[in-house]
From Swiss-Prot:
Belongs to the MCD family. Bombolitin subfamily. It is found in: Secreted. One of its GO terms (cellular component) is extracellular region. One of its GO terms (molecular function) is toxin activity. Keywords: Amidation, G-protein coupled receptor impairing toxin, Mast cell degranulation, Secreted, Toxin. Mast cell degranulating peptide. Its mast cell degranulation activity may be related to the activation of G-protein coupled receptors in mast cells as well as interaction with other proteins located in cell endosomal membranes in the mast cells. It comes from the Eukaryota. Expressed by the venom gland. Its main location: secreted. This is Bombolitin-5. It comes from Bombus pensylvanicus. The modification Leucine amide is found at residue 17.
Amino acid sequence: INVLGILGLLGKALSHL
């Protein structure tokens, strides 16, 4: 599991809200 990758996906999701 890539923590930085997950944080990146979460950041993208939040920016799309």
